[in-house]
Amino acid sequence: SDEELMRLSEPIRYDDIKFETETYRAGKKHIKKTRYKDNPFGKIVGRHDGAQFYTIGQRKGLNIGGHKDSIFVIATDVPRNIIYVGEGHTHKGLSRSCLRIASQDIHWIRTDLAMADGEIRRYRVRIRYRQPLHDAFLIKRPNGIFILFDIPQRGISDGQFAAWYSADDEMLGSGVY
């Protein structure tokens, strides 16, 4: 159903570890300084200079120590300046099996192959430059295209491109999610 596709395409939100915001002025530039905060226990584990500087899957530059496994950014909320992080390479917040590209952000190179609402097709999709192609279903709905990957993809971030290809590796279309 459309509701299920929307739910699957949204990043999973976790409250494992997040940041608490403090705002101050530094010179002429307004900077939001925040603290990493472990929600269940209120334990502060670090600081950062703004959610806008972090991407999903980022591990470097977090300056959080004392954990068994590496800490990764699993979600960001830039308007509220919150960063959610999780521990370990296999944290479920790092991967998603579905993403949505809004209708206005879809570009068909092969306009003769553009999908109609309700249509489902099988393509090979890439979400990063030089990434291997991955099998996925593209599902066209009035509010956009949903890409449902066979294998969940790691580090899907807003603002990235997805490009879909035919079986003979011809790029057919793309979009920003």
Task: List each language-model region with its residue ranges.
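AMP-forming adenylation/ATP pyrophosphatase catalytic core
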Residues: 1-177
